[in-house]
Amino acid sequence: MDSIDTKRLNDSNASDRALSGCAVLFLGCSSLEHNFLSLYKDERGKFSVFKVIKLTLSDSVGGLEGYEILKLHDADPYLGVELKFMAMPPCQRFLESYACGSLTQFLSQHASRLLALPDGVEIETQLKAGVHTLDHSLQDIEICLDHIRQSQPVRLRDDEVTQLEQQLQNSYGPPSQPPQELPRNCFLFQKRVFDDRPLTPADQQRFAAHVGRDWKRVGRALQKNCRALKGPAIDNLAYEYEREGLYEQAYQLLGRFIQSEGRSAKLSRLISALEETKMTSMAEIMLGIQPRD
């Protein structure tokens, strides 16, 4: 009997994690002249728009697994992004990020870096699965998941998306070479070598200005090798500086890390934590890497 119950439990867990379905994310701007659709239609801006979308999805879902972009299409005045989900956890994280506004925040950050959107432009989004507008059901994620399950893909990935994916991969550099020994006080990021050094107040300010709601995720990664951030330390920081806002919470987090670790609080450890939490674009900001068009 126990073995039967265990099998049912395992089957149930597998069923809970399995998911196949589609959703369409519509992206728009308050500016009629400078918006995602017009920039995507312009051959000079197409790749940059695609990169903004990929970075936004990676930050929202926490990685690149469990979903794919099938097609980008004209849904005037919006740019429609058709997404296929192949697993429950990434789909659920996507919905939660969309519901709490994190996805829009990520989109705004990446668009301001990579696209020439004028100051003051407001980003508009809408999410649909089949005939259902999921924005009306975000208070109940299970309903949204059911609608996505019912919306099955009717096409394979568009050739243009495949080409853009390949262009994005190529933009990160040539194929990997045989591993070489790194010089002392250096570290590797995206196949490039960077000088390692202790974190500075300028790093602290840059981190706080850009990390937003994800400062806690970075803190959880840093706490694995930092005694001062273990236990309830991160939650205590969140509570203590709640009134001051996200900037101060993030600033104090990295300050606590620097104060505790001294000269061992190095840039490489922060970049490693950002990589672990799939925050590649944030790592690029900390390293001052200019986006590639």
UniProtKB/Swiss-Prot annotation:
It is found in: Nucleus; Cytoplasm; Cytoplasm, Cytoskeleton. Keywords: Apoptosis, Cytoplasm, Cytoskeleton, Nucleus. A motif (Nuclear export signal) lies at residues 156-171. The keyword Cytoplasm applies. GO terms for cellular component: cytoplasm; cytoskeleton; nucleus; tumor necrosis factor receptor superfamily complex. A motif (Nuclear localization signal) lies at residues 216-229. Its main location: nucleus. Residues 200-290 form the Death domain. Transmembrane segments: none annotated. One of its GO terms (biological process) is extrinsic apoptotic signaling pathway. It holds the Pfam family TRADD_N. GO terms for molecular function: transmembrane receptor protein tyrosine kinase adaptor activity. Requires the intact death domain to associate with tnfrsf1a. Heterodimer with tnfrsf1a. Adapter molecule for tnfrsf1a that specifically associates with the cytoplasmic domain of activated tnfrsf1a mediating its interaction with fadd. This is Tumor necrosis factor receptor type 1-associated DEATH domain protein. The gene is tradd.
